[in-house]
């Protein structure tokens, strides 16, 4: 884990924006289960959870790719994607939970007088029901889904939209996510970004090379990067 730079507590951060899957919520168990149900429909054996977990932050594209070796544009991908999404929607929050200490982290962010919100590439049809089933997340000051703006991350539009909704200048927002596109979106939006190193990172990824200000190994470590109370 990278340590906060000297003077980090004096940074004029007024809002924290979070990715959802792999940052606030551990949704990989339900995403992997949905993918394996698609495989089961086709007479294929389930893939190990450890194989699928690193793909969970990449949505249907990543999971269907991992499960069937196809990509958007390939024959069969649209049907596999739609079947996967139907299975996922039918069992959206069976095993999904908040990561450890996320509820306490959000409460402390609020106690420090900071706004917070969620910016995810997950479509609203999945985002909104999931947040309702993970109550602390329903307090978010803004929720921007993958289809809220014309562009999804790594485009900066979703983050800029969230900043506008919170009434906070982009440079005074901090973005936290577990995928390279999250960090790219934050930088493009003019926001400092932090890697959620406890999320769904693949062993072949090199987050230390991403243009983030730091990496945290657990949610509570984010507090060291934020202004103190008062």
Describe the function of each predicted region:
Residues 26, 118-120, 195:
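Hydrophobic residues in well-ordered beta-strands that form the structural core
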Residues 17-19, 119, 176:
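Generic enzyme active-site microenvironment
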Residues 2-4, 9-104, 112, 123-125, ...:
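N-terminal helical cap/lid subdomain that shapes the substrate entry/recognition surface
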Residues 45, 115, 192:
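Residue-level detector of anion-binding/catalytic polar loops
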Residues 2-14, 50, 124, 128-230:
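Asp-based, Mg2+/Mn2+-dependent phosphohydrolase catalytic module
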């Amino acid at each position: 884990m990278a340590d906060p730079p000297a003077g980090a507590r004096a940074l004029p951060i007024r809002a924290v924006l979070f990715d959802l899957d792999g940052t606030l919520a551990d949704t990989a168990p339900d995403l992997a289960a949905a993918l394996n149900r698609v495989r089961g429909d086709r007479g294929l054996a389930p893939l190990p959870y450890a194989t699928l977990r690193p793909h969970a932050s990449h949505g249907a594209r990543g999971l269907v790719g991992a499960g069937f070796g196809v990509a958007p544009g390939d024959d069969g991908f649209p049907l596999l994607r739609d079947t996967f999404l139907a299975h996922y929607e039918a069992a959206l929050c069976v095993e999904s939970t908040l990561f450890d200490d996320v509820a306490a982290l959000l409460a402390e962010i609020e106690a420090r007088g900071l706004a917070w919100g969620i910016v995810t590439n997950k479509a609203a049809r999945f985002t909104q029901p999931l947040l309702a089933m993970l109550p602390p997340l329903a307090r978010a000051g803004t929720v921007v889904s993958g289809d809220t703006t014309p562009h999804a991350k790594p485009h900066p539009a979703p983050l800029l939209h969230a900043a506008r909704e919170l009434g906070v200048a982009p440079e005074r927002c901090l973005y936290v996510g577990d995928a390279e596109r999250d960090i790219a979106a934050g930088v493009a939006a003019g926001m400092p970004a932090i890697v959620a190193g406890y999320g769904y990172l693949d062993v072949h990824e090199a987050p230390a090379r991403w243009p983030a200000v730091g990496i945290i190994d657990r949610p509570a470590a984010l507090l060291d990067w934020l202004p103190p109370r008062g």
